[in-house]
């Protein structure tokens, strides 16, 4: 007997990139923001996966993460190195993968601002989000879209930063492995 899971509910956010403040993505020392290199796909995937797995808001969404988020990360990074890392010393503690030209119905903020749990609530997620939006703006985009869980701390506090406006809720596509079952 197979166990059916409820569809993953998401909320979509939109940012007008012309309204992003110029100095929004500043990080305080000892944290360093840098662009990930083309050979760092595995590191980006590991940070994104750990961030989602350890976030209680994404509990019960393992198939969505495995079948939708991680392939989106890999697709975006295979096209070009569009990932920002936050480092603390030699350790990568945060990542944000973005796609400048997503497929229809996809989002620009593929992973969102993923920060290791022990480094959260220090302004790192906000700086990572702002820097990602600035990177998209620098590539000529005028607006960006992203998804998160409804009523989560990211939906309440992070995504509204820098002019993020909540749009209609969406249901994530069914995971590939669930559809095949």
Report the location of each language-model feature.
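A short beta-loop-alpha structural element at the N-terminal edge
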Residues: 32-46
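Conserved active-site alpha-helix within GNAT-family acetyltransferase domains
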Residues: 1-6, 126, 150-168
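Hydrophobic alpha-helical core bundles mediating ligand binding, dimerization, or RNAP-core interactions
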Residues: 44-52, 73-76, 136
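…primarily DNA-binding HTH/wHTH and HhH modules…
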Residues: 161, 165-181
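Conserved acetyl-CoA-binding loop-helix of GNAT-fold acetyltransferases
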Residues: 115, 121-134, 138, 157-161
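A conserved beta-strand-loop-helix scaffold within acyl/acetyltransferase catalytic domains
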Residues: 56-113
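Acyl-donor-binding surface of acyltransferase catalytic domains
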Residues: 1-30, 173-174
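Conserved GNAT acetyl-CoA-binding A-motif
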Residues: 136-148
């Amino acid at each position: 007997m197979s166990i059916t899971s409820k569809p993953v509910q998401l909320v979509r956010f939109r940012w007008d990139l012309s309204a992003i403040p110029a100095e929004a993505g500043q990080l305080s020392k000892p944290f360093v923001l840098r662009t990930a290199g083309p050979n760092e796909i595995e590191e980006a995937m590991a940070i994104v996966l750990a961030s989602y797995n350890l976030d209680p808001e994404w509990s019960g969404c393992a198939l969505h993460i495995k079948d939708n988020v991680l392939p989106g990360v890999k697709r975006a990074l295979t096209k070009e190195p569009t990932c920002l890392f936050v480092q603390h010393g030699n350790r990568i503690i945060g990542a944000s993968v973005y796609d400048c030209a997503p497929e229809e119905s996809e989002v620009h903020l593929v992973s969102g601002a993923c920060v290791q749990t022990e480094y959260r609530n220090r302004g790192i997620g906000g700086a990572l989000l702002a820097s990602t939006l600035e990177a998209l703006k620098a590539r000529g985009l005028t607006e960006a879209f992203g998804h998160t869980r409804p009523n989560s701390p990211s939906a309440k506090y992070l995504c509204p930063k820098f002019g993020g406006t909540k749009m209609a809720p969406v249901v994530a596509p069914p995971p590939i492995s669930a559809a095949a079952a």
